[in-house]
């Protein structure tokens, strides 16, 4: 069966609440460890997300946990809670040996929807690592997420377009080739975003 990413929040309803598990009284570090327990991961995630910036130190420390499920969960949390100090750590997590962690890291770097007023990272921080993974990461899921991040800069950086065109032409995965094609001239996302002003496209407010 192919691996399918399931957002943690999609699993919330069938599971116990944080109050039932006593997580309201649990310290941040213990909650981060619970991200590696399939029976408690969703409730721990919700409680850490509720604590927000107050839990950031423990979440960042969790990026170095030996359990890849903990590292993945921390990347997902930073999707919502990312700040200036966390961006470099997320870039480093894209090199994680577990592909699920790399996927979560690239999503956190590329997605504005979850971040409220947080500025997006600029090309100086993320474009070269994203291009490298798009070209050579062994996992197609990671390459697909890298394409999304590279695509954010397709209107502002020729390196992004060149990398996406190469991926669209040569990637061994049809899914990655298709996604890369969305972000090059003539592609659906590229042409739709071309109608927006530069400020509306906004990957260009660097942290």
Please annotate each region the language model reported.
Residues 2-23, 29-33, 38-53, 58-64, ...:
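Structural detector for internal amphipathic alpha-helices that build alpha-solenoid repeat scaffolds
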Residues 87, 122-128, 160-165, 196-204:
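HEAT/HEAT-like alpha-solenoid repeats
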Residues 136:
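Short, Lys/Arg-enriched segments at the junction into DNA-binding effector domains
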Residues 182, 186-207:
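Terminal, low-structured helical/coil segments at or just beyond the last alpha-helical repeat
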């Amino acid at each position: 069966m192919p691996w399918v990413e399931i957002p943690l929040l999609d699993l919330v309803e069938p599971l116990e609440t944080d109050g039932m598990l006593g997580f309201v009284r649990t310290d941040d570090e213990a909650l981060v460890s619970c991200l590696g327990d399939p029976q408690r991961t969703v409730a721990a995630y919700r409680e850490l997300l509720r604590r927000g910036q107050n839990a950031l130190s423990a979440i960042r420390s969790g990026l170095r946990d030996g359990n890849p499920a903990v590292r993945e969960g921390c990347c997902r949390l930073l999707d919502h809670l990312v700040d200036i100090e966390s961006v470099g750590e997320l870039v480093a997590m894209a090199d994680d040996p577990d592909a699920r962690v790399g996927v979560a890291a690239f999503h956190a770097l590329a997605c504005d929807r979850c971040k409220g007023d947080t500025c997006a990272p600029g090309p100086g921080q993320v474009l070269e690592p994203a291009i490298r993974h798009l070209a050579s990461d062994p996992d197609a899921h990671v390459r697909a997420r890298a394409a999304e991040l590279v695509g954010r800069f397709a209107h502002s950086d020729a390196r992004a377009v060149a990398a996406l065109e190469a991926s669209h032409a040569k990637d061994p995965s049809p899914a990655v080739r298709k996604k890369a094609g969305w972000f090059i001239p003539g592609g659906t996302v590229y042409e739709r975003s071309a109608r927006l002003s530069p400020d509306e496209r906004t990957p260009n407010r660097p942290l």
